[in-house]
Amino acid sequence: MGRWCQTVARGQRPRTSAPSRAGALLLLLLLLRSAGCWGAGEAPGALSTADPADQSVQCVPKATCPSSRPRLLWQTPTTQTLPSTTMETQFPVSEGKVDPYRSCGFSYEQDPTLRDPEAVARRWPWMVSVRANGTHICAGTIIASQWVLTVAHCLIWRDVIYSVRVGSPWIDQMTQTASDVPVLQVIMHSRYRAQRFWSWVGQANDIGLLKLKQELKYSNYVRPICLPGTDYVLKDHSRCTVTGWGLSKADGMWPQFRTIQEKEVIILNNKECDNFYHNFTKIPTLVQIIKSQMMCAEDTHREKFCYELTGEPLVCSMEGTWYLVGLVSWGAGCQKSEAPPIYLQVSSYQHWIWDCLNGQALALPAPSRTLLLALPLPLSLLAAL
């Protein structure tokens, strides 16, 4: 079993017969497997706890990566300070309940009908504004208490001071729940390419990390999102959500929104998307445009919320937990709404992210309600062994 379900029995164990002990163990394993807890890496959407094998890709240019990869620990980020100004109620861990401050991917606003800026900020507490010299340039996503994930093409500027604004739905004003945090380190993928063919077509390895100068204080408005494992599979035609502020303007149109926007999109099959872009761009069919590290999502009405170039996160919900599955990377332009935007597929870069975090633990998804309700029986079985 994986770390998620591992238990250690200590002290003297009462003697039991071999058949009864084997039967109890078999029942325990079946219960845990049915609860989705055979191993953290095997649960759909969970981060794998297995040590990554691929060590060929390093992070550059401003970061030193460790020679060996850290294992993911069954723990939350090192800092869990709760600000009293925004934390109204603590949620103790009990049967059927999970402390949201000790897990990732938890949204503090469960009512999707609420559209006011404060409610939207609580609904997407991992959203941050990436800023250069104090001006918003892209969206970013909190993945750990000191780390923000974004796209590499937003980090190419030299001689600028990067910072992030967290906890605020507003792009141009501070609130009581918001804070500006300076960036300590900028990390870009070593194989990032601004273009593979021409102009806007086919950015490769468009991913970057920002290490903050201080750890974030989590609240209802500031929380990390969960990362998918390498075996995460998103079914075609799944419905997910894009959130962010969008472009400042495109061809004199689409003024940037002052508050966080949200848009539901439909996941497309990569092969169909690749065929579409071959017809759209006239690139020879022998050349693969949509790589396995990319993904497509259909959104045919982008005239108002244009988000193709600014790193907006693509997030999907599974059993009440939100996962970061993609980052907006490139596209044909919002005026060509029939062309689906292309996202970087986050699960393809799990190893790279592990390397660059250099041992800082990621928050893990909270155990499902099924598991919490099933645990008393396995524990009683263990006590009988």
From Swiss-Prot:
Domain of life, source organism: Eukaryota
GO molecular function, one term: threonine-type endopeptidase activity
Signal peptide residues on this chain, from the entry's feature table: 1-39
GO cellular component, one term: endoplasmic reticulum
Job of this protein: May be involved in proteolysis through its threonine endopeptidase activity.
Family listed: Belongs to the peptidase S1 family.
Name of the featured protein: Probable threonine protease PRSS50
